[in-house]
Amino acid sequence: MRKLTALFVASTLALGAANLAHAADTTTAAPADAKPMMHHKGKFGPHQDMMFKDLNLTDAQKQQIREIMKGQRDQMKRPPLEERRAMHDIIASDTFDKVKAEAQIAKMEEQRKANMLAHMETQNKIYNILTPEQKKQFNANFEKRLTERPAAKGKMPATAE
């Protein structure tokens, strides 16, 4: 039973670490004439579209946002090859080394923090190119998103019992 539990924990950590590595992975920019993918919802990605909804951005502001986003994409790096190999070595070993796994996870968490910090900095740069009226609308949109509960996609409504 202990081996089964250890295997389950190791698998869970490995899949979680793989998801973190996948989430940190960046993609190359699409050609300018390419249509956005359905889940990307617009020119600026899935969340940027909502951030700037109803703000009536000027062409100059849109260009500035594109430049800021391009700069952020250049900063976002995929985990180094040696980190991905180290993660694979932990997963593929005959025995699970918890200390080694925790050290690898800590290293990945540092990278995730750096990515989140860069993301917040980018959003601040974009916010600061808005006019005062656009900032007011942006803040109203933000408050609206906080108070409204999003509809769950693909889930059936709960039945009353």
Swiss-Prot record:
Effect of Q123L: Increased chaperone activity, substrate affinity and chaperone flexibility
Record bears the keyword Membrane: no
Keywords associated with the record: Chaperone, Periplasm, Signal, Stress response
CDD domains: CpxP_like
Subunit structure: Homodimer.
Family in the record: Belongs to the CpxP/Spy family.
The protein's name in its UniProt record: Periplasmic chaperone Spy
Name of the coding gene: spy
